[in-house]
Amino acid sequence: MTRTLLSWPGGRRLKWLVLAAWIGLLIVLQPLAGKLGDVESNDAAAWLPGNAESTEVLELSEKFQPADTSPTVIVYDRPSGITAADEAKARADATHFADGTGVVGEPYGPVRSDDGKALRTVVNVHLGKDGWEGLNAAAKDMRAIARPSAPDGLGVHVTGPTGYAADSAESFSSADFKLTLVTLLIVVTILVVTYRSPLLWLLPMISAGMSLVISQAIVYLLAKNAGLTVNAQTAMILTVLVLGAATDYALLLVARYREELRRHEDRHEAMAVALRRAGPAIVASAATVAVSMLVLLLAALNSTKGLGPVCAVGVLVGLLSMMTLLPALLVIFGRWVFWPARPKHGTEPDVTRGLWSRIARLVSGRPRAVWVTTSLLLGAVATLAVTLNADGLQQKDGFKTKPESVVGEEILTRHFPAGSGEPMVVIAKGASADQVHAALETVPGVIEVAPPQVKDGLAYVEATLGAGADSPAAMRSVTAARETLARLDGAQARVGGSSAVVHDMREASSRDRGLIIPVILAVVFCILALLLRALVAPLLLIASVVLSFFTALGLAALFFNHVFDFAGADSAFPLWVFVFLVALGVDYNIFLVTRIKEESDRLGTRQGALKGLTSTGGVITAAGLVLAGTFAALATLPLVFIAELGFTVAVGVLLDTMIVRSVLVTALTLDVGRWMWWPHPLARREDPSEDPAVSGMPDSIDSEASTTASR
């Protein structure tokens, strides 16, 4: 039944209905896709779970200050010392700031530093419905006010949370277009080289492009109506994932369609057979990726939780497009779209000895030596993963270049306490206000505690830290404050503020890693076990996935520490890398191992493994190059976290497709033999040949390897 349904999109009449349906969807949903940026939530506090202590403080603080405000710090500096004219300028600016875009309340300052070389003014800005785009507008207004009339030699910088948000928004302002363009160029280049046709690449790209637009529209609707958390990072990941995964599915389908065109004169019949034979593996792999992504719904961190449905939507829409729209387009355009190498009915491709035939011969000679050596080499690189610093990036280390907000913070910390402008906030019972105030003065790292405010039975206390709000020292102060205040009977004190938000995000990331990684491994194992009806093969494949993941982290640590000179990685980085590498690695596992199992049923496991490798090696490599290329496009973006993610996933995918899947897994299968399929009946069937020597490889293996390589 399923195979029959898969063959319908390429039918003589249905192909036009399929095309019309997709065009109709595009017309209806394209306007919504352009609104995705309107529902992005780029405020870190919004990513926290509702039960986080800092989230509770944010909600309770609305009794004492306007909700959804962001502090802006304007710092003035003169190395030789602030002059009277400088101070007059700062006071005049503060008056103008009060009338600026989104400003709430009166500016605080200017305050002179103890060394007399800097001034600081703090202005609160309302986030509004535009989020960080609104903060960008406010920051631009303040810069326009402060800079033009500044006395010669006086430096003026806008920093603090608003400054950082403005610089982040500026970084992303043209990033969507740039990322899409770079990704498309990478995919087109790989497709042209793979197909060796100036025309064929257009059809997968049209299908993938429509998939992206429709995915963005669906994600917009989910974010607007179902509370899905979407930020700029997940929106960009959606772009590269849809274009990469959809193109992977296209490569597999087109390869099988080309093969069937040589066997069937009628292109509709050829497409029906191609869909019946290649479709189940493609559907199974896409469904596995989607289910793996949906495991992220278990995450405590809303930004991570939102990533799962976003990616699942992208993968499933990409699958639907490549199983319906692409087949319709291919049969509409006919054989000529393969020009100049059109597959002719009744012909066979030139038989030459290809790369994967040679690799199969190498692996089959000494399979145990191959998989042991490969595992040891990968394991050696994997040990470098312990040097990866994934304790979290400070804001100042989050940019590949140094924007104004970073420069301003560096100046601020030279002349003022680093935590000024972003205080620790404590909410407690009003009757305990004095106790809380006294207790905060004993907390390590706290240099100043403001007088308590009491309202509606609650006390509000601000404490200034000597360290930067997202520094390790500030994290220790948050922990110490919570431990100290917990000892106050009846105070019910809760600690919030910028430092606590960062602290709680890192705690949530750590919790998510401990829960989600084992669950994903269990889910993937169950899916592979059901698909292969075996237990040994899934266990070995899971082990190879874990090895591939740690090897990718090891290479990432090597490059981050010694080549790119990054300060570290975000606390969510290991989990995101794991999810993508495992979910996408399952794709290639399914493509390879299902073909090995299919051939093993005819030839025995040893010969089936060799034929499976030579049959799929070329297309898996091309698919890996496409996906690695699309994720590598993320490395062109200006933010460190997204660049690190793109680099590591790209490296991991290349490792997975070229070494782990194609060499290690094949060698393991040869060595383990028929027991790979235990307890499936194949495990009890003797191989036709127990000797996988090169001379014993059937001619069909070499022939198909050559066919694959020639494509």
From Swiss-Prot:
InterPro entries: MMPL_dom, Mycobact_MmpL, SSD. It comes from the Bacteria. SUPFAM superfamilies: Multidrug efflux transporter AcrB transmembrane domain. Keywords: Cell membrane, Membrane, Transmembrane, Transmembrane helix. Its main location: membrane. Residues 685-711 are annotated as: Disordered. Gene3D superfamilies: Multidrug efflux transporter AcrB transmembrane domain. GO terms for cellular component: plasma membrane. Belongs to the resistance-nodulation-cell division (RND) (TC 2.A.6) family. MmpL subfamily. PANTHER family: MEMBRANE PROTEIN MJ1562-RELATED (PTHR33406), MEMBRANE PROTEIN YDGH-RELATED (PTHR33406:SF6). The chain crosses the membrane at residues 14-34, 175-195, 199-219, 235-255, 281-301, 313-333, 369-389, 516-536, 540-560, 573-593, 623-643, 645-665. It comes from Streptomyces coelicolor (strain ATCC BAA-471 / A3(2) / M145). It is a multi-pass membrane protein. It is found in: Cell membrane. It holds the Pfam family MMPL. The keyword RNA-binding does not apply. This is Putative membrane protein ActII-3.
